[in-house]
Amino acid sequence: MVRSGEREIRLYWPTLLVAVFLLAVAETSFSSRAAQFRASVVKIDITPDKPQWLLGYGPRQSTGTHDRLYHRIVAMDDGKTQFFLVSTDICLYSPSVYDDVMSALEAETGIKPLQVWWTVTHTHSAPEVGPPGLGAAFMGERYHHDHNTEYTAWVKKRLIEGIKEAQAKLEAARLGVGWGMAMANINRRALDLEGPAFLGLNPDGPADRQIGLIRLEKADGKLLALIANYAMHGTVLGPQNLLISGDAPGIVADYVEQKLGAPMLYINGAAGNLAPIYSVYPNFESGHLSQFRVLLGDKIIAGNDLIGGATSDVRFSLGEQIVETPRKANMGWAPDLEKYVRENNAGEAVIRLPLRFLRINNNVAIWAAPLELFCEIAMRARELSPFPYTFYFGYCNGWLGYMPTKAEFPHGGYEPSVSPYTPRVEDDVLRTVVSYWQGSGR
């Protein structure tokens, strides 16, 4: 049964104009009872022991460590398909890094790329990992130095080790889902009477305050892991800070773990135009970083407490679609990302944007992309979804730039100016997402 957005969904379906290529869909049967659901969680320390170039502002090297960085990995197995979700305390990485890791992982284990979603928390106080990718095309001044190949190789190695460990630790489990709400973020597209939008605070602008929650329990009902999906830049700390930190996402995850006694994966959402309410401060005290334990951490805990009806009858399906959307004219590109662009039959340069999909039973729909998505787009996709729980996982499997709304491109400012996309991209992506969920059935 389609909810209130039925008319809009039907309008999207017959007008699907975007060139979409179905690459792979690993479907499970939703008509028969699933085998025993299993899950596991692993937490792997990736804190460097030497100074590193930090990613997120201008070039700067770390002078120490404030809090530890981790790969947090959840594995799930419904008896037919295994799925691995990773949350890493870094800012960004190029899709070519994801491709390299997946190639090595598949060679060692047989695990396919479709089975692994590697997200980052988007802290701006963590080391660079891998080549700059698309960032060098419009922020070349930040990358006059070489990336640390030794640290990059270690982070990749630790990720593969963590996924293999999670696969080996799978145990009987149950899954529950729910919502929370927190006022920890704010729209950062500030407007004045004249001139383009600028990075600041816009309390009247759109902001997604919902927390998407997935609770994994052991067979006895004890918490195994919590997945919390909330949209917010990891920018409480500004460029003056030189201490390695997970910023607000890392502080919140650590706090929730201490309170609940199990790992928590912070999965960032459509944070392209959302800042933390305290943003770009020179140090931990002035940025009130510890306050996010209350602003967001306690709200995650409260939402977890309300989740009921966890079930061991879990079935899921995985899918991927490629959206081909025009590439902005005169926009540079990274040499390690040639597989993500092409020239179409009309001679137009297009970006090949990979979207991932995960459906859990008949009530949970999750989509993911390597984007800094504006929150309105994820909120609209959620509104139009026929599923009661629809989540967007951002910064997933690499980074292919900012994706503003069509309405925000004319206002200019930082995000539209560095985006590789055109105003058409919002329609291209929304049509694909809505059509995918409509076609998957209930």
Model-derived segments and spans:
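Glycan-recognition surfaces in beta-rich domains, encompassing non-catalytic CBMs
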Residues: I300
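Exposed boundary/loop context
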Residues: M1-R3, E27, G205, F387
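Boundary at the C-terminal end of the N-terminal hydrophobic targeting segment
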Residues: A26, S31-Q36
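Bacterial N-terminal signal peptides
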Residues: P14-E27
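N-terminal secretory signal peptides that target proteins for export/translocation
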Residues: M1-Y12
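Conserved beta-alpha junction segments in alpha/beta enzyme cores
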Residues: A34-T119, T123-P263, G269-A271, I277-V280, ...
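Anionic-ligand-binding alpha/beta catalytic cores of soluble enzymes and soluble regulatory domains
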Residues: L296
